Amino acid sequence: MNTMTAVHAGMKRSYRDMRGADSMMSPRSNTKEVLQQRPISRETSATPTPPNGAANRLEPRPRKVMFNFDATILIIGVRGVGKSSLGFLAASAYSRRLVESDRAFSEATGSSRTAYRKLHGPAEYQHTHYEVLKRLLETNSKNSVIVCSFADLEGEGAKLIRDWAQSHPVIYVRRDVAGIHDYIRIWSEERIQDVIRASEGLLQDCSNYDFYNVSETIDSLSPNEGPRHPSSRASNGPFLTLKRTEHDFLKLLRNIIGDHDRGRSHQSAYPLSQMSVDKLEFTSAVTLSAEDVVSRRIDLDEAQIGVDAIQLEVNINPAQGDTWRLGKHSCFNLIGEAFALLRRSTILPIVIDIAHDARDARQKQLSRAELLEYCFRLGPEYCTLDLTLDEAQLTHLLGGKGRTRVIGQYIADQRISDGWSGQACMDVYEKASGLGCELVKITMPDGNLTDNFAIQAFQQRVQTLNDGKGPRLIAYCTGRQGRTSMCFNNILTPVAPPVAVPEPMTPASGQSLEQLPLVTAKERSQALFASFVHEPMHFLIYGANVSFSLSPAMHNAAYEAMGMPHSYRTHSASTLEDFVTLVREHDFGGAAIVQPFKTRTLPMMDLLSPHAKAIGALNTVIPLRDEGVIASISSDVGIFRERNRTGPVKALYGDNTDWIGIRACIRRGLSPANTVRPQSTGLVCGAGGMARAAIYAMISLGVQNIFVCNRTKGNAEELAEHYNRLIRANGIAELSPSNAANTTVTALDSFQAEWPKNMRHPTMVVSTIPTQTLDGMPTNFTLPKEWLGSRTGGVVVELAYMPIVTPLVVQVQQIQSKGWILMDGLDMLPEQAFAQFELFTGRRAPRKLMRDEVFKHYSEDFLLGAALNTDSP
């Protein structure tokens, strides 16, 4: 059985197992050699000091948050939290050495820690341990990932690591007690809890970031990630148990040290993922308390519908609520777990908001500043900062924000004198701007209805003050009469979840009922349409025979759920004559284009995305009505800002989302053992329009060795040359410059040929071969068995979905035990539709809802017409 078959985050296993037998091992540590050359210092403490809480707290050091890109990452935590798994994921993603301190100690001394201590005594062990750890850090200070044992914090080890954190990222990994117990079965949960409590302070002193490792097994995979169609993907789960952990951990690493040459392979390609949510207009953030998230009282899939971000609300009053009853340890764990669960369940940015305490009670167990500092350690996209803190605290906190964007926040408990027209609000804005906050949030209770309009005047004053270049402003009135201002606030308006929790919503401790969000995202959307800020639009799918398309069901269900009075319909035609008329209608919102018009519509576009240009085909058309947007089309923000507005169409913009859908399927199905590396190989079967998109998707993932095979070899050669020519001319925006010189697309002779002997077997396969020939005969396409010879398996994306179980699907099912993951056409269809939805509406797609609609309406009879829209071989 493949070594990744039954792996859970936190299960100990060798680096060779995780990378695959044919992967290069990390170089051995040279610590033993150093110890032989240099005598061990006898000046260190001879008494082993177990990390046992406050008694071992270290002298405070400023928390460093910005590091050189090549700075080594160090991972610490108690036993059983999953440090080795996380180290493997980081080393694979960033192409770094993986060094484990336990192994380094064994190599240096010839025995394990326990055996060495028993043989030489505690004092000698402490001396040796200190020297081994010191040399380990010195010789691996760059381009490495070091996984430290819990024992490394003994004696002087903690000080070494604490000092190391002044120039390197040190990540403290937490985990729930039950998850740790599953790994360390000889320890009781009570003992584990005691160890965590005793060591937490020391671990936090030694680190500068936190990661909460969510325990997950195969059975806990979300419906969004796990198998959905039992006939095609019943056995994918075991190989993907680390997949979501990888996503979450790499998200934190990007926040800490930035991106890297192959970073694109771990990032989303959806259009709105390239935008900061605070640059868009009329965005919403659903407000969820940490308690509700951890207790699962909220359906997180439902809560995300219609919003652009998730606001995690944290209660700061220690006198009330379960949040604080058990002190700082429980508080940090609660926040960390809630944040991790949100990160696991969404692609939306997360805002951590410290709930406002009107009484400003001085914290007995935890100060607001300390809590804010912990929130920054999690690496959220946004975090609110209470502007009523003193200047020294504000400066200190902002110095530790890292890449997190800060919302300077002032929550007035009473209506300010002179309201929004006075100087007080402007003073708050200028203070936040001077501190370096990226956004400023000001709210106050509603005094009267005119305040809703006074806010508009205040926003204009702010705009004039800094010529539009300062922090963007979030401003609204709270309370029932303030709902109008909340609807018209431009950025990150807090909204209530759409489905009520089993018990009535109550304010967080210190909040008044007036401070709760009083509108849902759907209600806010309906208000914007009712007030003509947004307008109903018509969308369509255009092709030779699209009457059986699933797209209308997906999009119309999404519009309904989000409070958008849009409509999406099919339009079948044999020519583009109707298209010319439809796209000029004043309420035309956008069109999905399918065969045979993906290339024929190219000359009709006024502007093309870089993706559509490189692929040489489009599947998405959106209208442009603003001359300013047309003139500055390099800025995608303008495209999104003019969505949902009618008027004369002045230009047509063509894009391609097929590659995004294929790319997403590859990413979802590519296990951590097969993460993209320079030697990784991809295979595309077919040479039509979807094959073009598949090659582009692989290039964007950083795959440097791409093969294309088609029954007509000349078509494959033509397609390969198309991309090789673009690569030589630097004509692919998604191609990393560092990869360009080594990226090639090669046409194979035939499906009967041997796999090239000097190349690795593919770990990524995309089949664009239709299930029927033009005369209606089944193609019965399968791959040569030898081509699927990857020792770590891989992912196969079968784009055909009529029938859903093709001969290729059956072939892959038979080798799923060897690590092969299957994605089918019903995976790809909604993925590309999510991207189209974003381009059409400027809003995130309700992903689970749209997926559910696909399976709800799918039937082979219903999709009979879809065969006419597939690419020819």
Q: Where are the predicted features?
A:
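NTP-dependent small-molecule kinase module
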Residues: 2-68, 89, 93, 169, ...
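Catalytic beta/alpha-barrel core
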Residues: 287-289, 309-318, 328-331, 351-357, ...
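Glycine-rich phosphate-binding loop used to anchor ATP phosphates in small-molecule kinases
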Residues: 124-167, 562
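Conserved phosphate-donor/acceptor-positioning beta-strand/loop module used by diverse small-molecule
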Residues: 162-186
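Catalytic alpha/beta core domains of metabolic enzymes, predominantly
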Residues: 388-536
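Conserved substrate/cofactor phosphate-moiety recognition/catalytic segment
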Residues: 88-134
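Phosphate/diphosphate ligand-binding glycine-rich loop within oxidoreductases
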Residues: 536-672, 811
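Rossmann-fold NAD(P)-binding glycine/threonine-rich loop
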Residues: 623, 639, 773-854
